[in-house]
Structures are given as structure tokens and as C-alpha cells.
A protein has these predicted regions:
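Conserved mixed alpha/beta catalytic, RNA-binding, or beta-rich assembly cores of soluble enzyme
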Residues: 77-123
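Electropositive, gly/pro-rich neighborhoods at or near active sites that engage anionic ligands
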Residues: 2-77, 85-87
Length: 123
């Protein structure tokens, strides 16, 4: 199942979407490991911005360490609710502080985005 597609029509749409993404970025990510290509493909698909194929950097141990963290059900921290809601089958806790009262206060005080303030509040 790709991107939550569970019906035949949904799978066909998802397959076509994946083909379009691969046609746009395939050459730019061919040097990556298969797991890393999958990550970048999903980023490009969800943002609808092929430029992320060139902007995304994946550290050498990212796939291994993130897989370990997921297996251990460690908390996931995100700066926006759309991502929090999209992580809907995770057994650990997914946290987002974008609407926390301190986030609003901090963003005004420091004249920073709420997303940046949310990360400060979380830490």
C-alpha cells in the first residue's frame, strides 16, 4: 500500500503518482540507497515539489536510527499538525506544539514563525 491507498482505484492513482514523481526526480536520486529513494519520493509526492529531491540530505545512519526509534515507539516531534495527523498508524506518541499557548507567545516575542517557536517549546 502506497500513501494510504486501499481501493483498486486508489492504488491505481497512487501508482500513477509514483510514476510521475519518479519520472521527475529519478536521475537526481539514483545515487541513493533504495530506502533513501523511497523517503525522497514521498517527500516530493507530499510537497508536490521536485526541488526537494535536490534539497533533501539524509545522514548516513538516518534510516537505521529512525527505524530503531520507530521500533522502540519513541516519540515523534513535528512542527505542523498536518504531519501529526498524517502519522496515523504509529503506536508511539506524535507531538506537535504549533497550537500550544507558549508557541503563540514565543513567536510574537521573538518575531519567529510559529513552526520555529513550536520546536523551541517542545525542547
Amino acid at each position: 500500500m502506497f500513501m494510504g491507498a486501499s481501493t483498486k482505484e486508489g492504488r491505481e492513482i497512487a501508482t500513477k503518482s509514483r510514476e510521475i514523481v519518479r519520472s521527475l526526480i529519478g536521475d537526481k536520486i539514483k545515487h541513493l540507497k533504495p530506502e533513501e529513494r523511497e523517503i525522497v519520493e514521498r517527500i516530493v509526492h507530499s510537497t508536490a515539489d521536485p526541488e526537494y529531491a535536490e534539497l533533501t540530505r539524509i545522514s548516513a545512519d538516518f534510516v537505521e536510527e529512525s527505524s530503531k526509534a520507530i521500533k522502540e515507539k519513541m516519540d515523534i516531534l513535528t512542527d505542523i499538525n498536518m504531519v501529526r495527523v498524517g502519522i496515523n498508524r504509529y503506536e508511539g506518541e506524535v507531538k506537535c506544539y504549533i497550537n500550544h499557548p507558549l508557541t503563540y507567545e514565543l513567536s510574537k516575542e521573538q518575531e519567529i514563525t510559529r513552526a520555529a517557536a513550536a520546536m523551541e517549546v517542545a525542547l
